[in-house]
Amino acid sequence: MAKKAKKDGRSVEPTGNPILEVKYNDPLFSIAAHPTEPIFVSGLATGHVFCNRYDAERLEERMQAIKDEQKKKSKTSVKTTNAAWWTQVEDITNTDEIVTCWKTKRHKGSCRSVLFDPIESSVGKHLFTVGKDHVVKKANTETGKVLTKTDISKDLSSKDAVTKLCHSTTHPFLLSGTENGHVLVYDSNDLSNKFKVENVHEDAVNHILAMPSVSPYHYLTVGSTTLSHIDIRKGIVTQSDDQEDELLSMSFVPDDDRNDTVLVSHGGGIVTIWKNSKNKLMDQLSRIKVNKEASIDVMISAMDAGDDDMAASVWCGDSDGLVHRVNYKKGKVVETRLHGTADEVGFLDIDYEYRLLTAGMDSMKLWSAEGDDEEEEESEGEESEESEESDEESDESSGEESEGDDGNGSNSEESDSNDEDEVESSDDEKEKEEESTETDHKNIEAESGKQANKRQASQPKSAGENVKKQKLKQTSKLAHSHGIRRFDGL
């Protein structure tokens, strides 16, 4: 019997059903899903922040209706057509399925990170953002109005900037990683400075992960080629050996309530498994190949611990525009979804009902929480056919085995205007939006050319990168890069 052909990860037939796609007119730099409501917030390269509310039930129904209609008309799967079978909207929109709750010019320059308050007593009530302007702001999620803010320039060294935010799940600690490898800690109540951990990494901090089961003061960070375990009061607890590959993101798995097992994504297209109880996180224990042609830029736990398969899984987004579900117990990719052929996956989140949210600089997709009935039917059919063929071929002893497949919110009044942060009446930064946006676009255009050569040397190339569609806007010149380096100069 012939050996099954091994499929390339990039040629796997994508699975899953998107129910919503939001297309952005300016590069998306950060996105976050609300932990308890159907809301997501987007931070853009221009410094704007948008808050949208969606009706997931209507989106699911509309997607299913389109699929059923296509199947009724042509007796074929909707996935065989070139048309989208999900809802597509612009970033500012008001429909029955999705509305823009508020929008504002929150920062001068890019908005680099957005984050909802995860503390149980105030979960989702507050939104934290940080921009290129070195200002951290805390706002009311419902209205968008700023409650407090702080300029952290005094805490940064020359030519340093914040890349990533992280919040303790139990204490008012807001952590920020910087381009120079430091971690700054603020009191999230009033944004006063509390701690500073210097030289955690030699280069930018790519990701920060809280360790609530260990201590509210303990966190993991990745940056450059190392993983560090830090105590925000005392400094570095341990730092891993040099992995000789850039570490970009990480996640605990849902079935580990001790924060012991952590999965780490690499620039070389792999995911590695680490255990604190084995070797104090000094080195990886094993690795899982995901996509050798791309970098694994972002990772998040599947979170749904009610399902054994999902409880052992993480989602990984890569620079080829693919999203892979990796089961660490099986040591392999068990599902692959296509976010976009011309948009790298730089952001992942899980909404309040365990729906996957994927995003790149151009668009965001929200995926159905329901299983893919078509794929299950097709899979059963293929298995049946293969079984019959196998029986027939076994009699002849010469057959070859066929290749296997390894809530709706009300439309609130718009709060955008010509002034920065017009949504909040207390903010005194009054610059015209048109002037600020024009400056942002010039900065983006100028920096993109400067960074292009640098990125070419460090990033694995997508097979379709040279044929990416050209957009008729200034921001189309912005080059993509893996990890936190997409922020270079912005």
UniProtKB/Swiss-Prot annotation:
Residues in WD repeats: 23-64, 70-112, 118-155, 157-196, 242-284, 286-327, 340-377
Entry's localization field: Nucleus, Nucleolus
A GO cellular component annotation in the UniProt record: nucleolus
Biased composition (Basic residues): 469-484
Gene3D superfamilies (alphabetical): YVTN repeat-like/Quinoprotein amine dehydrogenase
Name used for this protein in its record: WD repeat-containing protein JIP5
One BP term from GO: positive regulation of transcription by RNA polymerase I
Organism, as annotated: Meyerozyma guilliermondii (strain ATCC 6260 / CBS 566 / DSM 6381 / JCM 1539 / NBRC 10279 / NRRL Y-324) (Yeast)
Region called Disordered, residue ranges: 368-490
